[in-house]
């Protein structure tokens, strides 16, 4: 038996042992696995297991607000509008300074009632964690009665409902040291067993306020990618998260389901010249080449995004032109443009004085060739492949990418000087503030390109302080493009947005994962579990 086959057999046996030990599968006489239709085995990718546990007040679920064990006051539904969860109703004052939530009378998985006191406790504890964010404008939290809570704000914050929808809540009585390893809450499931690095078993919460979930037991596998693939091929996994390098792999008895996500491949383009700004941590800032807006515009107009989707992503993706996706309510449709226009890109460069005078294929200006260092995480093969393809495309415009795989520490040290190819994206408009608000330049991973446009800064400030999301959306749209300027390609770009990633799953025939969002949040695999209480086998 060769080594690869031996490893595959070992992987299948290992997963079968894990699952079999949980009573998930039975082996009938014909040798084919028979499925208990009250259970399922799920694999959500190699990074789906939270290292610090399932504690939302420590940052778990903060990207998308999805949790098996807790519930939120509100959540984003399929069309990206706000849907009531534990809150049965809510009101916002006209001045945007008061948010009042009326609560459903619900119970936790341990049978104890969940009240306004637990809501207050959750938000006050979450405010202590820097990973949660956007809670700084809460002045006080008032408990009007056991099932009504009022948030008093220091100033209007149009993003507060997004924060509410992103924060699962915990019961005060159960929140103790080690909570993340044995969580109690109002979510659809309760933890039974967690063997870190291997699997987690959960059972339906019989107190769940939406009704007992269809599936009574779930097993989540936390194994390496090759082990998971072999187990999926053997029929031991019902929902299998498919990485791009396995996108073409066929799994008998399963169907591929793909969903657009807000997660994207993007290249940062530093906008200032070297020495034009000072970093508080003394990191080098500025790039001689990308500080010229002509370079940044040419790259955006000239690359062929669809070819990246077709050739690297196996068709499971879509071109991305900006952080903001067309599906969200704060998207400005005027920022749309046509890419793969190499002639336009060359014209932009020539008009700005970038010309190939020595015939070496690289344009230069004032003695400076258009050589650009592009960093990408050395451990991410897909990013390396994207980097190579956009490098080939940049050559068509006379721009030379110098590819340098780097560790996270090395990237952090040079992120304001060199271009960084990364994964990024969100459904939350707060990310426009993180990426494009001038005063954020140099603060950790915020505004790494040192973008600073006074009109855009003003629009972002107006959007964030608007009394409601509807008014804020108009300012977010102007920040993208107001007819004269903006952070989009039509204005003053500081990023090269490349492609939206699809989340792909091989789902067993006869198994339903329900209706999914039109645009999935950029999460570590858990996005599709937002409606997990409705998952189940066909009758």
Feature names for model-found ranges:
Residues 355-426:
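Ligand/substrate-recognition segments at binding pockets and active sites
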Residues 88-130, 288-289:
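Aromatic- and charge-enriched surface segment that lines or borders ligand/interaction sites
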Residues 81, 163-213, 217, 226-227, ...:
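Gly/Pro-rich hinge or "lid" segments in bacterial periplasmic/extracellular proteins
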Residues 45-92, 124, 184:
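N-terminal lobe/hinge region of extracytoplasmic solute-binding protein
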Residues 91, 95, 100, 133-173, ...:
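Surface-exposed binding/hinge segments that line
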Residues 116-122, 146, 150, 187-188, ...:
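Alpha-helical secondary-structure segments
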Residues 195, 199, 206, 300-332, ...:
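Detector for C-terminal structural segments
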Residues 206-250, 400-402:
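Ligand-site clamp/hinge motif
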